[in-house]
């Protein structure tokens, strides 16, 4: 009996050992297949691994083209962010020398030449001069429409172009990875924590700083005007008022004396004939002379030539000029950042990237410069001065381009500059142009419709440019 049991145990033990060996060999084959292959999550890597055990491994990652593409600085920043997150490109056989890079004198010539070309866009306003003038002076409705078009372009540029770039939300970053196996599915998703630091809020703070700085600049300019040229103007008018009044009063007294002496002579000579009527006419003459004297003393700002000058018009004119100067300042800062972007495009991607950036800036600046010109003329600048100062602020782009070329790359903090400029644009458009339009006389249905269409047209142009970009 024991011998028979022993005979049965031997095959059972052999079977168990065989199964154990099979199981171990199966794990030894499947484990290297899982551990030895490396997952390269790249910006354009799509690969599949076929093993003897039919283990298909497909990575669903967003594909990009394998060829070299000339990209703008914003796209470079996107690739740098992906590389820092561990999703760098898997193709290293790019021919970097094939891009038409520029060095030395050619780099400076192309970059500064394109920057000057963008600056010349401000002279597009010369085309508007034949349409703008009616009977030798600028048409009010056309100037108002240009100013509101500029305000709409400013608001659209601030909210649709500058702030998305400053906050880094202009491009979509996809960091979701999905892996499919035959026998199990698993997905990885990155969910960043909702915490804020000073660095995260720096762009928003720069926008608020731009609004506050432009408010302070406006207050400062108003204070200087009121205490320098304003006081001289008031003193000048006050002097003319008293001098003119004194002169008119002396002439009135002299005329009264002459009239009184002649009247006395008439009374003495013809006292018997018309005594009652003469007294009545004398009283009438004296009353009219005294009324003229009182009017000359209490009149409003009567000068030596008899014309009146209203101080309210002078105050309104100086108030509008302040926003004209603020517009020049903000436009200069904006053109400086455009020059920096143009210089970095030439420096990193050569002539192809630089010229593509130039074309975009031209499309971006043409409506902006037209609106700035309208705001300057609306603020009280003459047409010649508006053209000159607008072109002068456009030339600031050359300084931004030269700074990048000397520095060797973009010096950074461009997002803070973009935010600051956006804050200035918002302040000028809302507190300047729109507020002045609401306070400028009587509003009719026709004027309101024209103003609204001009404002929306400026915003629409900014939207189209942002979508094309």
UniProtKB/Swiss-Prot annotation:
Compartment(s): Membrane
Listed Polar residues bias regions: 257-279
Residue ranges, compositional bias (Basic and acidic residues): 47-58, 173-193, 247-256, 292-315
TM region(s), chain numbering: 114-134, 141-161, 201-221, 387-407, 415-435, 448-468
Pfam family, one: Zip
Membrane topology recorded in Swiss-Prot or TrEMBL: Multi-pass membrane protein
Keyword Transport: yes
GO cellular component terms listed in the entry, alphabetical order: endoplasmic reticulum; membrane
Protein origin, superkingdom: Eukaryota
Region called Disordered, residue ranges: 33-58, 170-197, 228-315
Signal sequence segment: 1-28
Basic residues: compositionally biased ranges: 235-246
Single GO molecular function: metal ion transmembrane transporter activity
InterPro entries: ZIP (IPR003689)
Key words, A-Z: Membrane, Signal, Transmembrane, Transmembrane helix, Transport
Function: May participate in auxin metabolism or response. Probable transporter.
Entry similarity comment: Belongs to the ZIP transporter (TC 2.A.5) family. KE4/Catsup subfamily.
Protein name in UniProt: IAA-alanine resistance protein 1
Lineage, opening ranks: Eukaryota, Viridiplantae, Streptophyta, Embryophyta, Tracheophyta
Gene this chain is encoded by: IAR1
């Amino acid at each position: 009996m024991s011998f028979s049991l022993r005979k049965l145990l031997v095959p059972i033990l052999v079977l168990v050992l065989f199964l154990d060996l099979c199981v171990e060999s199966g794990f030894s084959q499947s484990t290297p297949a899982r551990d030895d292959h490396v997952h390269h999550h790249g910006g354009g890597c799509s690969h599949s691994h076929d093993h003897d055990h039919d283990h298909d491994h497909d990575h669903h990652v967003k594909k990009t083209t394998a060829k070299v593409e000339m990209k703008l600085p914003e796209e470079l920043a996107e690739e740098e962010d992906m590389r820092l997150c561990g999703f760098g490109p898997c193709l290293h056989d790019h021919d970097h020398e094939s891009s038409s890079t520029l060095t030395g004198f050619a780099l400076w010539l192309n970059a500064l030449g394109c920057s000057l070309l963008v600056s010349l866009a401000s002279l597009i306003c010369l085309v508007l001069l034949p349409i703008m003038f009616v009977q030798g002076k600028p048409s009010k409705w056309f100037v108002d429409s240009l100013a509101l078009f500029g305000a709409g372009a400013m608001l659209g540029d601030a909210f649709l172009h500058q702030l998305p770039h400053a906050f880094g939300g202009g491009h979509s970053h996809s960091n979701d990875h999905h892996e499919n196996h035959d026998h199990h599915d698993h997905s990885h998703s990155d969910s960043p924590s909702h915490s804020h630091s000073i660095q995260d809020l720096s762009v928003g703070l720069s926008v608020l700083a731009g609004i506050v700085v432009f408010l302070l600049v406006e207050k400062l300019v108003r204070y200087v005007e009121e205490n320098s040229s304003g006081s001289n103007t008031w003193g000048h008018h006050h002097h003319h008022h008293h001098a003119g009044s004194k002169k008119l009063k002396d002439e009135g007294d002299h005329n009264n004396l002459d009239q009184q002496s002649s009247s006395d002579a008439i009374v003495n000579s013809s006292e018997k004939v018309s005594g009652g009527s003469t007294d009545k006419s004398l009283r009438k003459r004296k009353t009219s002379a005294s009324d003229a004297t009182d009017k000359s003393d209490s009149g409003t700002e009567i000068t030596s030539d008899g014309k009146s000058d209203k101080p309210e018009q002078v105050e309104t004119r100086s108030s509008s000029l302040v926003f004209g100067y603020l517009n020049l300042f903000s436009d200069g800062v904006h053109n400086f950042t455009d020059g920096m972007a143009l210089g970095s495009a030439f420096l990193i991607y050569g002539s192809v990237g630089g010229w593509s950036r130039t074309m975009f800036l031209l499309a971006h600046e043409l409506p902006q410069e037209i609106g700035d010109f309208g705001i300057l003329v609306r603020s009280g600048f003459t047409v010649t001065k508006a053209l000159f100062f607008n072109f002068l602020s456009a030339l600031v782009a050359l300084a931004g381009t030269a700074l990048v070329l000397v520095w060797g790359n973009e010096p950074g903090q461009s997002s803070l500059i973009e935010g600051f400029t956006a804050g200035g644009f918002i302040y000028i458009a809302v507190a300047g142009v729109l507020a002045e339009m609401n306070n400028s006389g009587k509003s009719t249905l026709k004027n309101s419709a024209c103003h609204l269409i001009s404002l929306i047209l400026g915003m629409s142009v900014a939207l189209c440019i942002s979508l094309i970009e």
